[in-house]
Structures are given as structure tokens and as C-alpha cells.
Amino acid sequence: MLELTMASVSGTDAGATAGMQMADAPSEPGAMLRVGRDRGACRLATPDDWLFVSRVHLEFLCGPEGTWQVTWLRGTHDDPSSEVRFALVGGAPQALPYGGTAKLPPGGAGEIVIQDRTGPCSVNVGFYHEA
């Protein structure tokens, strides 16, 4: 099972958890969770006017062995309006490249942050991948 929690944070309410959303999916091949502005395609949806987040920004996908990965999907622009950082609990944050994929270790937990390049807004997605 993969469990996600998401909070949309602006500079004025840093640290607030109001508006937190949660989603989960079983660790079955082909299971998918998405994060983005498109409420029809994404289980976790950001505010509509946060244009630094793509319609479908992050895709969590379960592979054939029941392991999960996250991909920052490429959008229509060559130069994205955001940066994405990935960190496991206890580890240093590292950049997730535009179009890049990171594996989520079984039993692992951490956070993925989508940061607006032009302002203080961010989308913080916490994850826990049950072993």
C-alpha cells in the first residue's frame, strides 16, 4: 500500500495543514496515484490558480513487483515553472529532474516538494510505502 498526504502551502501560512488531502492505493501492478491541477485525472488536486503545478504533475505508479516509483511528468513547456525535491526520512533532499523518476523503497517514507520558482508557494506530498 502507498499512502500519500498533500498540503498546499503559501508563504503566509507556512506550516499550516489546513486543506490537507489524503489518498492511498494498494501495491498492485498498474495501481496509480496522481498529483496536479486536473481534478478529473488526479486523486490529489492543487488549487486551480497555482499554474506552477501542471494539470498532471506527479505520477506514482506501482510496478510488476509491487514496488512504487514517482515520475515528474513533462508538460507542454520545455522550462517548468517549478522545482521538485525528493527526500526520504532522515535523508538529504535531492532534486527530481523534469521528466525524471525516483523509486520509493518498500517500508520507506519521505516527502516530495513542488516549489514555485517565482513565489513562496509549495505543494508538500508526504508518502509512506508499506513493506
Which residues are covered by each model-predicted region?
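Intrinsically disordered, low-complexity acidic Ser/Thr-rich regulatory segments
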Residues: 1-51, 61, 65, 101-131
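Beta-rich catalytic cores
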Residues: 54
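Forkhead-associated
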Residues: 57-59, 63-115
